Amino acid sequence: MPLPEKNNRVIITSALPYANGDLHIGHLLEHVQTDIWVRLLRANNITCHYVCASDAHGTPIMLRAKELDTEPEKMVEEFRSSHMKDLDSFNISHDNFYTTHSEENKYFSELIYTKAKESGYIES
């Protein structure tokens, strides 16, 4: 795959792991591969931002919280912290790592959507 042009800015992410359990080798493999790509771009002076989050949405979250007899939000934060600790131990260099319910995620999702719509990439 050719490198992006140096004047392009790139947003990179990995698949968001559910915040309902520990990371497994598949999660780690993907994050390591993505981190290698990020480091290659940065070594070539290409501006990129590596973002990810623990997925806090959906049935897997509700079922696991019920199984653990805890509030979903509390469980999500505990697994998010665990995910970050595991990824840090592999020197994964996320610029931002939130949850899908965080204020930061809401802000950036709305910002990206608004900019894309204003630029004509989204019609409604």
Q: How would you name each of these model-derived features?
A:
Residues P2-S124:
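N-terminal, positively charged nucleic-acid-binding surface of large information/translation enzymes
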